[in-house]
């Protein structure tokens, strides 16, 4: 910037100072010429003219240098000043930024919630004891989910579908600090989709249980868990509805008013806590329909399950086996009610307008019969063995029929396909 200023100054001086210097020099030349002429005209004036010429020449020289100095000095000083100012402008912004104070502390309320309760959230892996990794020799992971510690002595709450319906498997729990422990299934309620696990460790961080009955629509909530096996993941949103009846979701055998939220929940979040801004669990993440529509089991209902489970443990009649009574297919599904169908059709172009019933395959467990048979997440089952499938109960009835194979008609996008699945016996 300083070099540019000096260059511009030199150009300016050449353009505007030249006439002044020329005038000074020209006047000096004229005086010399006149003096020479006078000298030639008469010798009697030689001494006088010579004296005058010397004086005039000295005066003209003084006049020329004084004019040049008077003209150049201000511009030189101006150039120096402009270069300094220009240099300062490069170092300082033209508009000073407003200083913001305490914004991070005042508005990072989500981070405060996470800091208060994240240590109690765990990652749950289901290991297939029949298949082993080629390099490590360890059982491969068949599925995964989330949970959270509710007692210091190692009691963990999660979803039932995370830990059951998987024969020849073992359950493994990883804590937030990275420690891993084998877990045993202690109690299961398939109707409410809740289960408890136990790991042999004490002094664990415990999640506080809040009240779901005091929630309001629009209230901020935080979902914690391990979506897609990415443990310690946090998403935030609001409560969309506090009273979403199970009948609206096609879950006819359940009497639960689910919490609906727009917090991002996906595979692996199941069983994790839905937390309010006080760091209290107000729900258990259970299922997702589509982006922005997910559901959690309200914590007030969960407390009833925990009370019944504690009573069964005292009587010695708690859940003993990790295996289901029903044949195993390896999917998590959701009934497509009219409301859910309307939402799906409004959010995606990849669904036939004529579709009026079916079951949405939400998750397919790797290595399961459904996975081997070709089912994929997002498929919609409309028929099994030539019978219409209108809700998840129809799928369970088909499993109980005793037929070896299930011939399914599915929709994958707008394309109709057929797949055959052979469920495993318990």
UniProtKB/Swiss-Prot annotation:
Listed EC numbers: 3.4.21.108
Name of this chain's protein: Serine protease HTRA2, mitochondrial
Residues annotated as catalytic: 161 (charge relay system), 193 (charge relay system), 270 (charge relay system)
Family annotation (CDD domains): cpPDZ_HtrA-like
Keywords assigned by UniProt, alphabetized: Apoptosis, Hydrolase, Membrane, Mitochondrion, Protease, Serine protease, Transit peptide, Transmembrane, Transmembrane helix, Zymogen
Protein source organism: Drosophila grimshawi (Hawaiian fruit fly)
Record-stated family: Belongs to the peptidase S1C family.
Function recorded in the entry: Serine protease that shows proteolytic activity against a non-specific substrate beta-casein. Promotes or induces cell death either by direct binding to and inhibition of BIRC proteins (also called inhibitor of apoptosis proteins, IAPs), leading to an increase in caspase activity, or by a BIRC inhibition-independent, caspase-independent and serine protease activity-dependent mechanism. Can antagonize antiapoptotic activity of th/Diap1 by directly inducing the degradation of th/Diap1.
Segments for region (Disordered): 31-59
Low complexity composition-biased segments: 31-58
Matching InterPro entries: PDZ, PDZ_6, PDZ_sf, Peptidase_S1_PA, Peptidase_S1C
Serine protease: region residues: 143-306
GO molecular function: serine-type endopeptidase activity
Membrane topology of the entry: Single-pass membrane protein
PDZ domain boundaries: 329-414
GO cellular component: mitochondrial intermembrane space; mitochondrial membrane
Catalytic activity of the protein: Cleavage of non-polar aliphatic amino-acids at the P1 position, with a preference for Val, Ile and Met. At the P2 and P3 positions, Arg is selected most strongly with a secondary preference for other hydrophilic residues
Protein location: Mitochondrion intermembrane space; Mitochondrion membrane
Segments crossing the lipid bilayer: 71-87
Motif (IAP-binding): 79-82
Gene Ontology terms describing biological process: apoptotic process; positive regulation of apoptotic process; proteolysis
Oligomeric and partner information: Interacts with th/DIAP1 (via BIR 2 domain).
